[in-house]
């Protein structure tokens, strides 16, 4: 199990508004059988808007491959946002996202970039 925290920005797809955010969460990972350089992980991430204090969370799944000599990792991410935000994070309610996971062992950082999945079914409006 891994515990993580971070910060970054989120861009609202329809308006381009930039939201400053922090996050924390937990993930469970394991090696993929017969692919010793590949890890799967899944978990929950709490997302907090620095701008207005709004909160949300995502459930995510990742497949990450590592270079065993450098420990650099790269992979793919799928995630879905909870549908409970009421402030600046509300445009992300129920949004399905996909992206990339990049680990840099020299800086001990992970960068995750997510994009709205455009091939999904339309969400019902409240």
Q: Which ranges hold each PLM region?
A:
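Beta-strand-enriched cores of mature, soluble protein domains
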Residues: 1-126
